[in-house]
A protein has these predicted regions:
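Jelly-roll (double-stranded beta-helix
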Residues: 9-14, 19-161, 166-230
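N-terminal secretory signal peptides that target proteins for export/translocation
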Residues: 1-8
Length: 230
């Protein structure tokens, strides 16, 4: 893993709605709770003790009822042990264990002080829509070459840290790719489709911060037109 801090300080300008007018309407869809290899590319809740498929997107960490500012940064750290991460974790932090590592996600200002661990990335600013409270969720995805997500939206920003492979994000205003060690983010309510390019299995951590009164995500009727390139 690179020791260089990856800092993403742009909001992915292609997400601005003035480029496309009003987005295609979203089709409300409840969060999936059943793990099934038949539908591996919709992020599903992992029930403790349940065996999950080899490939898919799995919601593995959550922090509810957060009182966040209108713009926050995602600080991602790794720790040598669960105990070490617990000692450094704030009340709003999220700890997950994937890819043989212990990951801690914290949210705050760009210069939020660190309390230990190895800082992997700082992603943001992530713009939040007004809400009484927000919920932050961490997902872990493992996708094969040419796999793709459903077309979907979120009521808040979505951000990624790519662990391995290359992923391509298609939106109404174009495409964007990220390789291992890189990050990307999009603004709320933007229709999108995520796919894997290249010959390597892609693994990533995903953050979605959404209105606590709304679902994790919703299916969208928007249809991608631009092609992803390897």
């Amino acid at each position: 893993m690179t020791s260089r801090i990856s800092v993403l300080t742009f909001n992915v300008g292609f997400a601005l709605l003035f480029l496309i007018g009003r987005p295609a309407p979203a089709v409300a869809e409840p969060a999936g709770k059943v793990l099934s290899a038949a539908a591996p590319h919709m992020c599903v809740v992992v029930v403790p003790g349940e065996i999950r498929p080899e490939f898919g997107c799995f919601r593995i960490g959550i922090a509810k009822d957060l009182k966040l500012k209108r713009a926050v940064f995602w600080h991602l750290y790794t720790f040598p042990s669960r105990a070490a991460s617990e000692a450094a974790k704030s009340p709003s932090g999220i700890i997950v264990e994937e890819d043989g590592r212990v990951w801690l996600s914290e949210f705050g200002s760009k210069n939020r002080p660190s309390h230990g661990g190895h800082q992997v990335a700082v992603v943001g600013p992530l713009r939040l829509l007004p809400a009484e409270s927000h919920t932050a969720e961490i997902a872990y995805s493992v996708m094969q070459p040419d796999d793709r997500s459903r077309v979907h939206t979120h009521s808040g920003p979505e951000a990624w840290y790519v662990i391995s492979g290359t992923q391509c994000l298609r939106t109404p205003s174009g495409t964007r790719s990220a390789r291992a060690g890189a990050t990307m983010s999009v603004t709320p309510s933007l229709p999108m489709e995520l796919s894997v390019t290249g010959a390597e299995i892609a693994r990533s951590l995903t953050l979605v911060i959404h209105d606590s009164t709304q679902e994790f995500g919703a299916a969208s009727n928007w249809k991608p037109t631009d092609a992803c390139r390897p």
